[in-house]
């Protein structure tokens, strides 16, 4: 299968990076099941660069946190599930180049293939630019997650922690609502509310609905901590 150039240009806008060497992006999207130059070497490179970018940011962000907590936070941020979430925010599955068998079995929806594609794009962007540029790009992708992760606690995302907190107290689950969507389709900003019975609702903003919900959930967790 081939991906139209117009779709790849839209993907560039979603990932917020424009390739000088367009063939690197095409290779990053090519699974080994497809004919041609596949993405496994780029994935290998991207995995190391991702670990470097997240490690250095966590090291600077948490100067008093020990190696164990830093490692746990990094593992949470760079795990396959998290990378697949980011890939879905980019609608990466629609752009993957798969062989007929993988395509038929729904490989474009598989977490592992999407996560590998994200790492391959990181590797491709590094070869296309430099380490500082690609580090800034990675930190932009992970911004809301880096802003909500904390040491010394279960490394679950804020929505999950909020849900488990309420369920443990047999309270109704939170309600999330879209308050506003601004911007063009490729550059939208969402404002979401999070409401719980008996507490003032809070708002979160982000470049995707999920990011805005996570930020709102984190604010609600802070409100619940203050209410204790």
Curated annotation (Swiss-Prot):
Principal EC category: hydrolase
Binding site for Mg(2+): 43, 116, 119
Keywords: Cytoplasm, Endonuclease, Hydrolase, Magnesium, Metal-binding, mRNA processing, Nuclease, RNA-binding, rRNA processing, rRNA-binding, tRNA processing
Record GO terms (molecular function): double-stranded RNA binding; metal ion binding; ribonuclease III activity; rRNA binding
Description of how the protein assembles with itself and partners: Homodimer.
Keyword check for Transmembrane helix: no
Names of required cofactors: Mg(2+)
Signal peptide feature range: none
EC number: 3.1.26.3
Gene that this sequence comes from: rnc
All residue ranges annotated as the RNase III domain in the record: 8-130
Source organism phylogeny: Bacteria, Pseudomonadati, Pseudomonadota, Gammaproteobacteria, Alteromonadales
A Pfam family this chain is assigned to: Ribonucleas_3_3
Record-linked InterPro entries: dsRBD_dom (IPR014720), RNase_III (IPR011907), RNase_III_dom (IPR000999), RNase_III_sf (IPR036389)
GO biological process, one term: regulation of gene expression
Disulfide bonds: none
Superkingdom assignment: Bacteria
Gene Ontology CC terms, in alphabetical order: cytoplasm
Family from the record: Belongs to the ribonuclease III family.
Catalytic residues of the enzyme: 47, 119
Record bears the keyword Hydrolase: yes
The reaction(s) this protein catalyses: Endonucleolytic cleavage to 5'-phosphomonoester
Record's subcellular location: Cytoplasm
Domain DRBM: 157-226
Name this polypeptide is given: Ribonuclease 3
Chief location bin: cytoplasm
């Amino acid at each position: 299968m081939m991906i139209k150039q117009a779709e790849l240009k839209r993907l560039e806008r979603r990932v917020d990076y424009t390739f000088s060497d367009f063939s690197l992006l095409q290779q990053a999207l090519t699974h080994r099941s497809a004919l041609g130059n596949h993405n496994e070497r780029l994935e290998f490179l991207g995995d190391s660069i991702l670990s470097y970018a997240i490690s250095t940011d966590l090291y600077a962000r948490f100067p008093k946190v020990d190696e164990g907590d830093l490692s746990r936070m990094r593992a949470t941020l760079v795990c396959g599930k998290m990378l697949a979430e980011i890939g879905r925010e980019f609608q990466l599955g629609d752009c993957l180049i798969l062989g007929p068998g993988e395509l038929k079995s729904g490989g474009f929806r598989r977490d592992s293939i999407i996560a590998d594609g994200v790492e391959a794009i990181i590797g491709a962007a590094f070869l296309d630019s430099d380490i500082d540029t690609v580090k800034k790009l990675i930190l932009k992708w992970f911004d809301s997650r880096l802003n909500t992760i904390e040491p010394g606690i279960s490394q679950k995302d804020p929505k999950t922690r909020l849900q488990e907190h309420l369920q443990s107290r047999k309270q109704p689950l939170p309600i999330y609502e879209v308050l506003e969507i601004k911007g063009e389709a490729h550059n939208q900003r969402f404002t979401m509310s999070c409401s719980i019975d008996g507490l003032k609702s809070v708002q979160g903003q982000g470049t995707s609905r999920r990011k805005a919900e996570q930020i709102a959930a984190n604010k609600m967790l802070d409100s619940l901590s203050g209410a204790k």
